Swiss-Prot record:
DNA binds at H104, R123, K169. This is Formamidopyrimidine-DNA glycosylase. A zinc finger (FPG-type) spans 255-289. It comes from Mycobacterium sp. (strain JLS). GO terms for biological process: base-excision repair. SMART domains: Fapy_DNA_glyco, H2TH. InterPro entries: DNA_glyclase/AP_lyase_DNA-bd, DNA_glyclase_Znf_dom_DNA_BS, Formamido-pyr_DNA_Glyclase, FPG_cat, MutM-like_N-ter, Ribosomal_uS13-like_H2TH, Znf_DNA_glyclase/AP_lyase, Znf_FPG/IleRS. Belongs to the FPG family. It catalyses: Hydrolysis of DNA containing ring-opened 7-methylguanine residues, releasing 2,6-diamino-4-hydroxy-5-(N-methyl)formamidopyrimidine; 2'-deoxyribonucleotide-(2'-deoxyribose 5'-phosphate)-2'-deoxyribonucleotide-DNA = a 3'-end 2'-deoxyribonucleotide-(2,3-dehydro-2,3-deoxyribose 5'-phosphate)-DNA + a 5'-end 5'-phospho-2'-deoxyribonucleoside-DNA + H(+). Keywords: DNA damage, DNA repair, DNA-binding, Glycosidase, Hydrolase, Lyase, Metal-binding, Multifunctional enzyme, Zinc, Zinc-finger.
Amino acid sequence: MPELPEVEVVRRGLDAHVTGKAITAVRVHHPRAVRRHEAGPADLTARLLGMRITGTGRRGKYLWLTLDGGDEPLARRAESSVALVVHLGMSGQMLLGPIPKEDHLRIAALLDDGTALSFVDQRTFGGWLLADLVTVDGTDVPVPVAHVARDPLDPRFDRDAVVKVLRGKHSEIKRQLLDQTVVSGIGNIYADEALWRAKVNGARLAESLTKPKLAEILDHAADVMRDALGQGGTSFDSLYVNVNGESGYFDRSLDAYGREGEPCRRCGAIMRREKFMNRSSFYCPRCQPRPRVRRA
């Protein structure tokens, strides 16, 4: 699943190419892609026509385009506090360029300068919906995103406040890093990378870690995601691409994730993989020893 860096790469690409442009045509090729828009495909299509894209936003793994009524009458401009929310799911792609002729095209839109915007999604977990914007903690976000915490790359991210929350959690630190209501955007890959950099096993209880160590983990999470962003994100297959259809290459720089059986880049011990929450965790048994189980 695309994590924060991959979604931010897509947001930046869209921001540079679609902001200020009006939507002139929309076609939903598969109803599942708009299942989260409760009023249905016809409503979404009708409301999008003529709307102008005024900007882009992101919170964690959620992406949206802010909209207004463009050149429509004032009555239509009441939609100015609306956003087109895009969830990429496991394999969603927002592509600019000729509309692709392929089986996984779910939605296609045309803009007033002739630009085509396509939503391609092989596994169909992603989709589009229109949602009202609400102000949460001084920031306008779509209603479906209102519950999502700020992410470590957000300028208003309060690291100390998150550390305080983590100190009160009687559960594994990795589980908390993946909880989007605590801190958003840190998915499985970047959680493993941050924990490796901090020399902390993901099975450690959050409450057992000191405030400085928790702050260090969050700082590493921010750093590794900035590093990934600089390399276009992480692509293990062709499913994650930017708006031009290009893959990221941060997978070549990963220190933990996907490196089972390989030597730790820091100490040389053989990296291990364990099952965790229907996922896999990768860690160094020497640098990141598992917590001891207390016997009764």
